[in-house]
Curated annotation (Swiss-Prot):
Protein name from the UniProt record: Glucans biosynthesis protein C
Keywords: Acyltransferase, Cell membrane, Membrane, Transferase, Transmembrane, Transmembrane helix
Pathway assigned to this chain's UniProt record: Glycan metabolism; osmoregulated periplasmic glucan (OPG) biosynthesis
PANTHER family linked to this entry: BLR4337 PROTEIN, GLUCANS BIOSYNTHESIS PROTEIN C
Gene Ontology cellular component terms for the protein in this record: plasma membrane
This protein's record includes keyword Disulfide bond: no
Protein family per UniProt: Belongs to the acyltransferase 3 family. OpgC subfamily.
Membrane-spanning intervals of the chain: 17-37, 54-74, 91-111, 140-160, 173-193, 212-232, 240-260, 274-294, 311-331, 338-358
Natural source organism: Salmonella typhimurium (strain LT2 / SGSC1412 / ATCC 700720)
Job of this protein: Necessary for the succinyl substitution of periplasmic glucans. Could catalyze the transfer of succinyl residues from the cytoplasmic side of the membrane to the nascent glucan backbones on the periplasmic side of the membrane.
Subcellular localization, as worded in the UniProt entry: Cell membrane
InterPro entries in alphabetical order: Acyl_transf_3_dom, Glucan_succinyl_AcylTrfase, Glucans_biosynth_C
GO molecular function annotations of the record: acyltransferase activity, transferring groups other than amino-acyl groups; transferase activity, transferring one-carbon groups
Length: 384
C-alpha cells in the first residue's frame, strides 16, 4: 500500500472516456453498415461500414490496457480487500443496475420490433436462457469481463508487487518488436484454443455466458496485464507514448488484413481464428498510436474534459437502447445514410446528456450508475 499518490494521467483519463464515447458512433454506424444487426437501414453505406470496422478492430484492446494500468495503480494504493471491493462495486453495480433498467426493456423492444414475441413460448428452456444471456448482458459485457479480470488479477498483481519490493528497479528490457512477437503468439494461442473448442464442442461457442466469461476474458487478459506492466515500468509506458512509425504502418497493414478477412473469410473455415491474430497485434500497435496521440493532444486538465470523463460510463450504458430505438423507429424515415448517421448522433448524445443530468440529481440513481457511495460531509461544530 502506497501513501504517495501517483500523478494524474489526464491523457489516459481522456482516452478512456473517448473510447467509451466511441461506442455511440460505432453502434449508430452499425445500423448503416453491411453487417447484420438488430436494426439496419434499407441500403448499407460502404464508408460507414469501413468506419465501423476500424473502431471495432482496436477500441476495446486499448481500453483494457488503460483499465489494467489504473487497476494496478489503485492496487498499490489500497489494501487488497478494499481494492477488490471498490473495483468490483464500481463496475458490478452499474452492470447489475443496467440489466433491469436498460437491457431488459431493450430486449422487450426488440422482441416487438423483430416480431419474435409469438416465437418466445416455443423456445426450449436453454434457448430462452441463452437468448436472455446474450440480450441482457448485451453491451455490458466489458463490465462483466472487468469484474472477472479484477478477481483473476489478485494473484498476478500480488506477485508483481512482491517482485517490485524484492528486486531492484530496472528497465523493462523489451522492445515493441519483441512485444509484437509475443502478442502475435498470444493471438495464435487464442486461435488454437478456439479451434480446439470448435472441433470438440462447437455448440458452446454460441453460448452467451461462455463467450463473455471465457472467450472474451481470455482475449483481453493480455492487454489488461500489459497495462499493469506499463505502470510498473515507466520506460515501457514511454514506448507507448512515443510515436512509432512502425506501429502506425503495422496498424494500417493489420487493418487492411482485417478488412480482407472480413470480405473473403468464412465462419466455417478460419475467419474467426485469423481475426483473433490480426486484432491481437493490431490492438498492441494501436496502443502506441492512441497513447502517443493522446499524450500529445489530451494531457491537460479541463473542466469540460473532466465532465465527459465522469459522464462517459453513464452515456455508454444508456446509448445502446437509444440507438436501437432510433434505428427501429426513426432510421426508416431518413433516406440519406449520412443524414441519418448525423441525426442519430445528435438524438442519442442529446438524450443521453439530458438523462445524465437528471440522474445526477437523484442520489439513488447516481449511486447505482456509478457504484460510488455518496460522500459523507461532516457538519462543522460551532465553536464559542
Amino acid at each position: 500500500m502506497s501513501s504517495v499518490p501517483a500523478p494524474r494521467e489526464y491523457f489516459l483519463d481522456s482516452i478512456r472516456a473517448w473510447l467509451m464515447l466511441l461506442g455511440i458512433p460505432f453502434h449508430i454506424s452499425l445500423i448503416y453498415s453491411t453487417h447484420s444487426w438488430h436494426v439496419n437501414s434499407a441500403a448499407p453505406s460502404w464508408w460507414l461500414t469501413l468506419f465501423n470496422d476500424f473502431i471495432h478492430a482496436f477500441r476495446m484492446q486499448v481500453f483494457f490496457v488503460i483499465s489494467g494500468y489504473f487497476s494496478y495503480m489503485l492496487f498499490l494504493r489500497y489494501p487488497l480487500k478494499h481494492w477488490w471491493k471498490v473495483r468490483v462495486e464500481r463496475v458490478g453495480i452499474p452492470m447489475l443496475t443496467a440489466i433491469p433498467l436498460l437491457t431488459l426493456p431493450q430486449f422487450i423492444l426488440l422482441q416487438y420490433v423483430k416480431e419474435k414475441t409469438e416465437n418466445w413460448p416455443t423456445l426450449s428452456a436453454y434457448e430462452k436462457y441463452n437468448t436472455l444471456a446474450w440480450e441482457l448482458i448485451s453491451h455490458l459485457w466489458f463490465l462483466l469481463v472487468l469484474v472477472i479480470l479484477t478477481t483473476v488479477s489478485i494473484g498476478i498483481f500480488t506477485w508483481f508487487q512482491k517482485r517490485q519490493e524484492t528486486s531492484k528497479p530496472r528497465p523493462a528490457a523489451i522492445s515493441l518488436a519483441k512485444l509484437s512477437l509475443i502478442f502475435f503468439l498470444l493471438g495464435v494461442a487464442y486461435a488454437a484454443i478456439r479451434r480446439i473448442i470448435f472441433i470438440v464442442y462447437p455448440a458452446i461457442l454460441s453460448d452467451g455466458m461462455f463467450n463473455f466469461i471465457v472467450m472474451q476474458t481470455l482475449f483481453y487478459v493480455p492487454f489488461f496485464i500489459l497495462g499493469a506492466l506499463a505502470f510498473i515500468h515507466p520506460d515501457l509506458k514511454a514506448r507507448f507514448t512515443t510515436p512509432s512509425r512502425g506501429c502506425t504502418l503495422g496498424a494500417a497493414v493489420a487493418f487492411i488484413a482485417y478488412l480482407l478477412n472480413q470480405r473473403y473469410g468464412s465462419g466455417d473455415a478460419w475467419m474467426y481464428e485469423t481475426e483473433s491474430v490480426i486484432t491481437m497485434v493490431m490492438g498492441l500497435w494501436m496502443v502506441n498510436v492512441v497513447f502517443s496521440l493522446g499524450h500529445r493532444l489530451l494531457n491537460f486538465q479541463s473542466a469540460r474534459v473532466t465532465y465527459f470523463v465522469n459522464a462517459s460510463l453513464f452515456i455508454y450504458l444508456v446509448h445502446h437502447p437509444l440507438t436501437l430505438f432510433f434505428g427501429a423507429y426513426i432510421t426508416p424515415h431518413i433516406s440519406s445514410n449520412l443524414i441519418g448517421f448525423l441525426c442519430g448522433l445528435i438524438f442519442v448524445m442529446g438524450i443521453a446528456l439530458i438523462l445524465y443530468e437528471i440522474h445526477l440529481r437523484i442520489p439513488l440513481l447516481k449511486f447505482l450508475f456509478s457504484g460510488k457511495p455518496p460522500v459523507k460531509r461532516e457538519s462543522r461544530a460551532t465553536i464559542g
